[in-house]
Amino acid sequence: MREIVHIQAGQCGNQIGSKFWEVISDEQGVDPPDIPGDSDLQLERINVYYNEATGGRYVPAILMDLEPGTMDSVRAGPYGQIFRPDNFVFGQTGAGNNWAKGHYTEGPELIDSVLDVVRKEAESCDCLQGFQIAHSLGGGTGSGMGTLLISKIREEYPDRMMMTFSVIPSPKVSDTVVEPYNTTLSVHQLVENADEVMCIGNEALYDICLPTLKLTTPTFGHETLVSAVMSGVTCCLRFPGQLNSDLRKLAVNLIPFPRLHFFLVGFAPLTSRGSQQYRALTVPELTQQMFDAKNMMAASDPAHGRYLTASAMFRGRMSTKEVDEQMLNVQNKNSSYFVEWIPNNIKSSVCDIPPKGLKMSATFIGNNTAIQEMFKRVSEQFTAMFRRKAFLHWYTGEGMDEMEFTEAESNMNDLVSEYQQYQDATVEEEGEFDEEEDVEQY
């Protein structure tokens, strides 16, 4: 069975990650008392995320943080028992929102013990498919130490997939002033070392939580939303499905150029907890919701860019034919939003088991050039501070060089212009609506 090793780093990563395990355990039928589900569908691929230990306990992830606080609350939580105690790796100092501490000073002291646990988990796999890391890019541990871990794992397992769920900070919902620094330095690493990055914007979650889920503070809503997406992205891996059944297939279908592996993710239906049982959704409704900018988890409007590729994962009992028709329908009606030099660029898959409490749902992953808006915004904030060298002493004090900041900045700007280049790729034919005739002339 092709396993995925799950790692959660830093406070945000651990909050999202532990919620993810609650959702997954619920679906796979692993209760807190550790009795695995009895239906064959639940058990068939349970090993993708779980490994069996003595007494039939199913023990998943690796948790790491530079301070013990979050770990303690995870351990005390309802699912704290399903984690193996030696998979909690934590320091005592904390990174204090400082990327340099996570990456260069505090992080490296802890990294070897994390890698030992990673090795131990990887060795117990029959056929390791890859790693998934949940972290945020705005803090110190998830961003600094998270990217350090990613590069170390890259060295040791160069041919395994590396997927990250990265929470990208936003100007509206900001925890720390130095977020632009931390984010830019992290993106610099993720461009080089990750295979697939699911970008989750803080601000977008805020916007979703407010109107649709009727939550005023995005705390509970956050993790639930993100874990809905994580569970949707990985449901093909956990339950028998028809298409995109592993991380590598996902990557092959979604990444036309190696550096452009930052994805927008969305989820449908988004309803508040109370109102979800009153209406059944149809496949067309799901499709429409799924492509709606309001359902995107990153603060980029897909309408401002074009889709290079996209992948839609439907869950529940529905006809595959209907799904395919809907997908074609979307492409035909909105052809200007899809680049015409990649024909059939939406992949769809259907998995028979819907998430808990819903008849059917859809998870959407899109490689859209509009994601550059998010990087642009961070980059502008970065430049504003870096020009005055504000807060820089915290980083240089940990042994960093200004050169590294300049490199990270230009790497991120390159990324933005690459997205822009492919967005404009066939700008001549855009003028009229008779694109088809134009294409024939060229």
From Swiss-Prot:
Protein name according to UniProt = Tubulin beta chain
Give binding positions for Mg(2+): 67
* Location of the protein in the cell: Cytoplasm, Cytoskeleton
GO CC, sorted alphabetically, is: cytoplasm; microtubule
Task of the protein: Tubulin is the major constituent of microtubules, a cylinder consisting of laterally associated linear protofilaments composed of alpha- and beta-tubulin heterodimers. Microtubules grow by the addition of GTP-tubulin dimers to the microtubule end, where a stabilizing cap forms. Below the cap, tubulin dimers are in GDP-bound state, owing to GTPase activity of alpha-tubulin.
Per the UniProt record, the lineage of the source organism begins with: Eukaryota, Discoba, Euglenozoa, Euglenida, Spirocuta
Needed cofactors, names only, are: Mg(2+)
Per the UniProt record, which residue ranges are transmembrane? Answer: none
Task: Give the GO terms filed under biological process for this record.
Answer: microtubule-based process
- Keywords associated with the record: Cytoplasm, Cytoskeleton, GTP-binding, Magnesium, Metal-binding, Microtubule, Nucleotide-binding
Quaternary form?
A: Dimer of alpha and beta chains. A typical microtubule is a hollow water-filled tube with an outer diameter of 25 nm and an inner diameter of 15 nM. Alpha-beta heterodimers associate head-to-tail to form protofilaments running lengthwise along the microtubule wall with the beta-tubulin subunit facing the microtubule plus end conferring a structural polarity. Microtubules usually have 13 protofilaments but different protofilament numbers can be found in some organisms and specialized cells.
